[in-house]
Swiss-Prot record:
CDD domains: SerRS_core (cd00770). GO terms for biological process: selenocysteine biosynthetic process; seryl-tRNA aminoacylation. PROSITE patterns: AA_TRNA_LIGASE_II. The lineage of its organism: Bacteria, Pseudomonadati, Pseudomonadota, Alphaproteobacteria, Hyphomicrobiales. It comes from the Bacteria. It is found in: Cytoplasm. One of its GO terms (molecular function) is ATP binding. Its EC number is 6.1.1.11. It comes from Rhizobium meliloti (strain 1021). This is Serine--tRNA ligase. Keywords: Aminoacyl-tRNA synthetase, ATP-binding, Cytoplasm, Ligase, Nucleotide-binding, Protein biosynthesis. One of its GO terms (cellular component) is cytoplasm. Consists of two distinct domains, a catalytic core and a N-terminal extension that is involved in tRNA binding. Belongs to the class-II aminoacyl-tRNA synthetase family. Type-1 seryl-tRNA synthetase subfamily.
Amino acid sequence: MLDIKWIRENADALDEALAKRGAEPLSASLIALDERRRAVLQSLQDMQSRRNAASKEIGAAMAQKNSELADRLKAEVADLKNALPAAEEESRRIEAELSDALSRIPNTPLADVPVGADESANVVTRVVGAKPGWNHKPLEHFEIGEALGLMDFEGAARIAGSRFTILKGQLARLERALGQFMLDLHTGEHGYIEVQPPLLVRDDAMYGTGQLPKFSDDLFRTTDGRWLIPTAEVPLTNMVREQILDGEKLPLRFTALTPCFRSEAGSAGRDTRGMLRQHQFNKVELVSITDAESSIDEHERMTACAEEVLKRLGLHYRVMTLCTGDMGFGARKTYDLEVWLPGQDAYREISSCSVCGDFQARRMNARYRGKEEKGTKFVHTLNGSGVALGRALIAVIENYLNDDGSITVPDVLVPYMGGLRRIEKSA
């Protein structure tokens, strides 16, 4: 959420930032709404002050035995008391209206983010590794998995409907191995603290990270009003909500391997075959909580941590700097890691690493206090995939396919597979 004080002082900057995101200017309407809020609040405070003053004057009038003045003051106090509930309700209503309007405004992009309307304007930042050179025809992951008898989409559809997958045998073990490898890497070498967070969260948590109120259609809600998490970013980031942290102990770095649940409401007709776009999938998430001065450097560090997963798996990928029109709602800058999938003859996103500034912290009221500073500041938050297990599995299956249809297990995963080096069709 953006600060209304900043908007009042930087109206042109806000409208320019919104234009870069392809949105209409909003500063004038927001400032007008804020002026109404301030006027209503001032009127309410004036009424409260006059009620309090008149109440004191009644005592003075009674002491002077001026019953006429005392009666007038009593009538005035009674009128003010009767009028105050409506004034308080109007103040609450306009405060909520402004808060709702602010909650729907996307974050402002950093100055070095490329300007563009959609993914076609994203910029290749670097390319790592090389595409595999084969003699055999590349196959898509679902063709390989079904041929091995270890990937079942029809069975999943009978149980749960479309966009679900059943993994069996050594493919199920391979996905588990990927998750264990990623957690060991991030906790053992990258300094992240492993967390097992709730998978169900309240409205406030979704609001804090920016999924609500604007993106409820992308989420699954339970009958008791809780939400299934679309990413572990939600519970991990909300671990610091309503807290004042010790600035000397920042950054905090958290990681979690969780199922994620998404309705894919806007994805009709896209990636309908296979497990690229699922209602339920597993993902390792990275979250950092930093001070205001360190978040840009932390963004580069987090991206490097996610890249290390792909490097150790021996996968070819590229890093994209997303343009203003393709960035997420809460991001100030985002790097996407796109892994090469031979079966699709395309790069596909496998990780997205974003720096959010104090955008989420304002929604969560998460602050820190520096050692030499008076008062508090909002923390800065960052999040990234470290990485999505299903897409990592797809990349391994397609890139490590052998001529005979078997899959070579990447060296780094062999210890997690009990020494198994090749996945073959079961007899």
